[in-house]
Regions:
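Short conserved loop adjoining the S-adenosyl-L-methionine
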Residues: 58-62
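A conserved beta-strand element that flanks and buttresses the S-adenosyl-L-methionine
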Residues: 68
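Conserved beta-strand signature within the Rossmann-like core of class I S-adenosyl-L-methionine
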Residues: 95-102
């Protein structure tokens, strides 16, 4: 099992704990941010999880049954995303799955703006200040490049996936499942 962009390793640790009785599963958390991995080693250590400080676009994946990625592919340069999904498809065993969650762009600017406003209201209701929200928005400009739902599904199809769908959606965040 690979977790691409594992951050602090929280999800991977929960997954490993849930399946601790299955002896042949190896878990790999991959992230480019060393401090996240230091935290993962400290707070989410497990003997069957290996945390790797690697750039996924340059890392060779071993054969796997499951690859997960939460809010990571949207930060990969658009021209490299297809290559990454091709690599993921090739590394999956037959019947293996890719589960990923991404921010998606709507088909029109008006809808994007409305969803963005709803999400900002949600952040304010949860204690974020306007300054924090604006600073976060500025920090992501030019780095976070969301694609539309259709563009994400098209990339999966070009990579070779046939069985793929959106399995959940909340505002501008979409959950995709693709099975080889």
């Amino acid at each position: 099992v690979y977790d691409i962009g594992c951050s602090t390793g929280t999800f991977l640790k929960k997954l490993a704990d849930r399946h601790k009785n299955k002896k042949n599963i190896k878990y790999y958390g991959i992230d480019v941010v060393k401090n996240m991995l230091k935290y993962a080693h400290k707070k989410n250590y497990s003997k069957n999880i290996k945390y790797l400080n690697k750039d996924i676009t340059k890392f060779k994946l071993l054969k796997s049954d499951l690859i997960i990625s939460f809010y990571t592919i949207q930060f990969i340069q658009p021209k490299k995303r297809q290559e990454l999904l091709n690599k993921i498809y090739k590394s999956l065993n037959w019947g293996g799955a890719l589960i990923f969650v991404e921010k998606v762009r709507s088909y029109d600017a008006r809808t994007n703006e409305q969803i963005s406003n709803i999400y900002e209201e949600f952040k304010i209701e949860n204690g974020f200040t306007l300054k924090e929200i604006i600073n976060k928005k500025k920090s992501l400009k030019g780095i976070l490049e969301p694609f539309s739902s259709k563009a994400n599904l098209d990339m999966l199809k070009r990579a070779g996936f046939i069985d793929m769908s959106t399995v959940g959606k909340y505002l501008s965040f979409e959950f995709f499942l693709a099975i080889k």
